[in-house]
Amino acid sequence: MAPKIAIVYYSMYGHIKKMADAELKGIQEAGGDAKLFQVAETLPQEVLDKMYAPPKDSSVPVLEDPAVLEEFDGILFGIPTRYGNFPAQFKTFWDKTGKQWQQGAFWGKYAGVFVSTGTLGGGQETTAITSMSTLVDHGFIYVPLGYKTAFSMLANLDEVHGGSPWGAGTFSAGDGSRQPSELELNIAQAQGKAFYEAVAKAHQ
């Protein structure tokens, strides 16, 4: 039976949503499929308006109950970094997972991450590394992007791009004006494909 994959993300300005769509495309390229979820917004609309945040994609369900993820075999987490860590919206979600932590409900499931940062030194690798403490506490098995399927893209020095062996990544610029490049989306697609293939192989 094919593994069940979820892609869980938070995206204020749409960068991580575009990366999530690319990850999904890669999973589908590998012959699988995935369910997209977004974590709940915690900022009031008045604040979001002042930040010029566009409306969220209403076609993607909001993940209110962490128990929903118990039915999935692998989960990709899309994280827009806040000081090299999860943003508050994601932290609020994780704070709801006490029951799953206590019961080991996520133990043995597979996880990967992809990120967005405002600047080159903004935490492309640090955000992924910081997420490990949460994933390890829950017993997730981390599946990195690595270099095997994306070496030429990750090693491309012809243009500025996000991404690392920890996972795909994009730069948004400090004001959110930069959108994911074709190269960054291709890296995300490669990650989705490789992640699904790895989970499917282990799931046999």
From Swiss-Prot:
Alphabetical list of SUPFAM superfamilies matching this protein: Flavoproteins
Location(s), subcellular: Cytoplasm
Transmembrane stretches, start-end: none
Pfam families, sorted: FMN_red
GO CC, one annotated term: cytoplasm
Annotated InterPro entries: Flavodoxin/NO_synth, Flavoprotein-like_sf, Flavoprotein_WrbA-like, FMN_Rdtase-like_dom
Annotated keywords: Allergen, Cytoplasm
Main location: cytoplasm
UniProt keyword annotation of Cytoplasm present: yes
Molecular function GO terms recorded: FMN binding; NAD(P)H dehydrogenase (quinone) activity
Flavodoxin-like domain residues: 5-195
Family: Belongs to the WrbA family.
Protein name: Minor allergen Alt a 7
Gene name of the record: ALTA7
